[in-house]
Amino acid sequence: MIPPHEFSAERVVFDALGVALSALPDDTPIAIAYSGGLDSTVLLHAAARIAGAGRCIALHVHHGLSANADAWLAHCAETAQALGARFDAARVDVPRASGQGIEASARDARYRALETMCARYGARTLWLAQHADDQAETVLLQLLRGAGIAGLAAMAPQYRPALADVVRMRPLLHLLRAQLERYAQQHALRWIDDESNTDTRYARNALRVDVLPALAPHFPGFRDALARTAQHAAAAQRLLDDLAAIDLRAVARADVRVLSRDALVALDDERGANLLRYWMRSLGLPGASAARLAEMVKQLRAARDAHALRVDHAGWRLRLYRDDVQWEAGDGAASEAARADVADDDAADARDDRADASAAARLPACALAWRGHEVWRLPGWRGSFVFSPVAAHEHDAVPEALLSSAALRACARAGGERMRTRQGGPGRTLKNLFQERGVPAWQRDVPLLYVGERLLFVPRIGVNRATHDGADAPGGWRRIEWRPDMLIA
């Protein structure tokens, strides 16, 4: 860390940004998260001078949490215009009952908005203005919360979240707030002060206002020491991630969204939890606490069937079907009836007759007079039927004449439906066909597609050959697909 008086404030800030710029291709746009506070004001001003204002895009997020939010937005727009930088802003609604606290909810909403705006301008790099004092606060806060290695690693100088296209860079992370203040004073910059930053009811503010000033006289180098702790933790976390990547290759199916339960529980508890943490992060799911991960491992070890597994996390549900472990959206997509159905794959077909008790069965039937539609969107089912033009007799293809011969209907299973999957084959229950294909019960709540009163197509099974036997027909042909809106990427 550079002592605050060793060089001029301008020199150290410009040097820090020069290092960040050297990692970027020439002339690429640089998005800057601009709140209007001291830190981001210094970052925007210095970036405009070093990189050129034409490359800079100041992005502001209006949370609506302060009565001054509109004034802050106007100030930021005016400042960016004066510097010659482009400016954009987004208004977000911060959920106050999300269960994760107002600070975390605001942070999540802010990053989502920033990444959306970055995409709008084709920016692949987002500069953030956190500095060494922020890093010290983060490390100490994580220590007091009993965080693990990942938490103690705190903020990385450069980081790209899983599934994200934008790299977050923190060019000022090794500089002190005092150095940024000196820069702002040298250039007579104007910035806003968020009144909430002094509210010590928030843990971070309490550390900044009360705790860190008390540490400074007794431990003058505490910021350097905490920064080194973060670096050591980051190195240890990289090793844990390397181990988890090795384990994931051994435990995952061909589709890495699915793990083998037997292979997972062959690992010891700590290694299994490490793998689950890494796997969840690779899927873009919210992180889980050590206690939550330990509970997942415990339940996976103890579960004798899928009905015994019950792990919900951040709107998702951990599922077990046969030997497959996977996450599914948990917002009502699966029913209690379907969960019970998993417990005994060999139960009588009569059990399937209870499908009308499921959440899906409560969805209204939908109808469509087909006139060459390529997509039939069904919002209630969170998906679409897709009718793609294909050559005759391709897999799951039917004649256009059949599709237009009567109204198409999409409705829930009533129980006891039967279909033929091959010409001349026997009629079989949907339950048997789902089981044969290894479709978990919670994925069986799908809309059945009828033409008139005849069952035509079932997602994850295919075309009913009792309705269309593959015979030649005049005109075009369409392949039918069901595409859910919500998939883990």
Swiss-Prot record:
Domain of life of the source: Bacteria
Binding locations of ATP: S35, G36, G37, L38, D39, S40
Keywords: ATP-binding, Cytoplasm, Ligase, Nucleotide-binding, tRNA processing
Pfam families cross-referenced by the UniProt entry: ATP_bind_3, TilS, TilS_C
Record GO cellular component, one term: cytoplasm
Catalyzed reactions: cytidine(34) in tRNA(Ile2) + L-lysine + ATP = lysidine(34) in tRNA(Ile2) + AMP + diphosphate + H(+)
EC main group: ligase
Entry EC no(s): 6.3.4.19
Annotated GO MF terms: ATP binding; tRNA(Ile)-lysidine synthase activity
Main location: cytoplasm
Subcellular location: Cytoplasm
Gene Ontology terms: biological process: tRNA modification
Domain commentary: The N-terminal region contains the highly conserved SGGXDS motif, predicted to be a P-loop motif involved in ATP binding.
PANTHER family given in the database record: TRNA(ILE)-LYSIDINE SYNTHASE-RELATED
Protein purpose: Ligates lysine onto the cytidine present at position 34 of the AUA codon-specific tRNA(Ile) that contains the anticodon CAU, in an ATP-dependent manner. Cytidine is converted to lysidine, thus changing the amino acid specificity of the tRNA from methionine to isoleucine.
UniProt record similarity statement: Belongs to the tRNA(Ile)-lysidine synthase family.
Record-given protein name: tRNA(Ile)-lysidine synthase
Gene, per the UniProt record: tilS
